[in-house]
């Protein structure tokens, strides 16, 4: 059980929808500090959060997740002056715009990866940090494909791949930073707007989503926090239809586990065994 009490949490997302509801729940967990980095200032939302727990310090910065990593580093140097350290980094910035592939990929995947690469040194135990937890908030269509939102789905598949790769013991045993993901099902806020399919053949289905049964952002936010509290390194959760489900992960490449062992091994005999097994296949 991951105890959020006293933690310093940094949430990179727009303060609305899932992000706002998740932040509301976090404020009930007796966290010490909450940094909100978002593209647009939302003072009413910040005031609403502060009213939940007056003793929790809330900091706000306008933030463009698509900025270059060099600029991001300067940005987080300033953030760390106020935060001192980060226990939990939540990546929740998201965009579904099938007509703007670059923006969708840059927001959902590239920006998230740059954020993680920028923040990790502050958390890394071998670099003076205390370890911690990185939470990537993504989508169920990062687990299963979507014929309607192809670019969005591709970006979310990337989030899952990045999460699983970074959670490998190769990193975790060194830096002490656990990495997990929560795949959210569709919410009312997501479907209640104009949605464009990647190809015109899928537009009818995109339009029908407005009538589809969806979870509320409040329930989804609650389950994101539930997943954080129950988390272990490398876990992927589904938050959908009011419930929370742990994903059973699979290895599809038959040499995956041997390949990882090969990379980590310094024993020549072990390496020869891997190569022999690979060539037999």
UniProtKB/Swiss-Prot annotation:
Residues forming the catalytic site: 152 (proton acceptor)
One Gene Ontology cellular component = cytoplasm
- Please state which protein family the record places this protein in: Belongs to the short-chain dehydrogenases/reductases (SDR) family.
Record-linked InterPro entries: ADH-rel, NAD(P)-bd_dom_sf, Sc_DH/Rdtase_CS, SDR_fam
PANTHER family in alphabetical order? 15-HYDROXYPROSTAGLANDIN DEHYDROGENASE [NAD(+)] (PTHR44229), ALCOHOL DEHYDROGENASE-RELATED (PTHR44229:SF8)
- Sites binding substrate sit at 139
Signal peptide span: none
Q: What is this protein called?
A: Alcohol dehydrogenase-related 31 kDa protein
Give the molecular function GO annotations: oxidoreductase activity
What PROSITE patterns would the database entry show?
ADH_SHORT
One Pfam family assigned to this protein is adh_short
Per UniProt, NAD(+) binds at: 11-34
State the UniProt keywords alphabetically: Oxidoreductase
